[in-house]
Structures are given as structure tokens and as C-alpha cells.
Curated annotation (Swiss-Prot):
Keyword Ribonucleoprotein: yes
NCBIfam families (UniProt xref): uS13_bact
Task of the protein: Located at the top of the head of the 30S subunit, it contacts several helices of the 16S rRNA. In the 70S ribosome it contacts the 23S rRNA (bridge B1a) and protein L5 of the 50S subunit (bridge B1b), connecting the 2 subunits; these bridges are implicated in subunit movement. Contacts the tRNAs in the A and P-sites.
Record GO terms (molecular function): rRNA binding; structural constituent of ribosome; tRNA binding
Provenance organism: Alkaliphilus metalliredigens (strain QYMF)
Family annotation (PROSITE patterns): RIBOSOMAL_S13_1 (PS00646), RIBOSOMAL_S13_2 (PS50159)
Keyword annotations: Ribonucleoprotein, Ribosomal protein, RNA-binding, rRNA-binding, tRNA-binding
Composition-biased stretches (Basic residues): 101-123
Name the record gives this protein: Small ribosomal subunit protein uS13
Region annotation Disordered: where it falls in the sequence: 95-123
Pfam families: Ribosomal_S13
Length: 123
């Protein structure tokens, strides 16, 4: 298994797809990296030479913010929004959708499972 940026890449996958297992690298970024290094998109990870793996590793470490650093930056950005008490920060704090979606119905992913409020029966 090739290990890049602290992530074990699956051996049987194509390099294009395998790189997307690294947090912060999607298909488009993966294709840019492969174009820059000159590695064929259809190559399987198990078929990469040690030189090619090192080249990928160097390029990703130098030019891209991935894994722990990126996660830390995102969490610090959210923390800053919460501290300055802006609208987006308040939505994060309350666990509601941040980007303007309606919440009268739906929004269950952010709000969690439905909690029914009990009421007294009439006599």
C-alpha cells in the first residue's frame, strides 16, 4: 500500500480515484496532480514505482493543504465564526443549516432526529 499524507491508499484502485481518499483532494485536484507529475490516470496504485510515489508525496506536501492541517483550519474557521457571534456562527452553535436552507420542514440531517413535544389530553 502506498502511504501519502498519512493515508494508506487502496492498492487495487486507479491512481486518480485512490488520491481522493486523502482529505482535501477530490477528482479534479487528483487529475491536476497527475498531470503535473506526468503519471497516467489509468495506472493502478500497486503498479506505481517508488519514484512516482515519492514524486506524488513531494508535490502534495509542497502545494496542497490536506488531512490534519486542512481539518484544523476548517475547525478554526468555524470556531472563529462562533466567537464573533455572526449569523453563520450562531447557526453552527445551534446545529442548524448554515447556508440559508429552510428549516420549517426537512433539515433533519443538521437538526437530528425528530423530538415530539408532548401535550396534555383534554378531559
Amino acid at each position: 500500500m502506498a502511504r501519502i499524507a498519512g493515508v494508506d491508499l487502496p492498492r487495487e484502485k486507479r491512481v486518480e480515484v485512490g488520491l481522493t481518499y486523502i482529505f482535501g483532494i477530490g477528482r479534479q485536484t487528483s487529475n491536476k496532480i497527475l498531470a503535473a507529475t506526468g503519471i497516467n490516470v489509468d495506472t493502478r496504485i500497486k503498479d506505481l514505482t517508488e519514484e512516482e510515489v515519492n514524486e506524488l508525496r513531494k508535490l502534495i506536501d509542497a502545494d496542497y493543504q490536506v488531512e490534519g492541517d486542512l481539518r484544523r483550519e476548517v475547525s478554526l474557521n468555524i470556531k472563529r465564526l462562533k466567537e464573533i457571534r455572526c449569523y453563520r456562527g450562531i447557526r453552527h452553535t445551534k446545529g442548524l443549516p448554515v447556508r440559508g436552507q429552510k428549516t420549517k420542514t426537512n433539515a433533519r440531517t443538521r437538526k437530528g432526529p425528530k423530538r415530539t413535544v408532548g401535550r396534555k389530553k383534554k378531559k
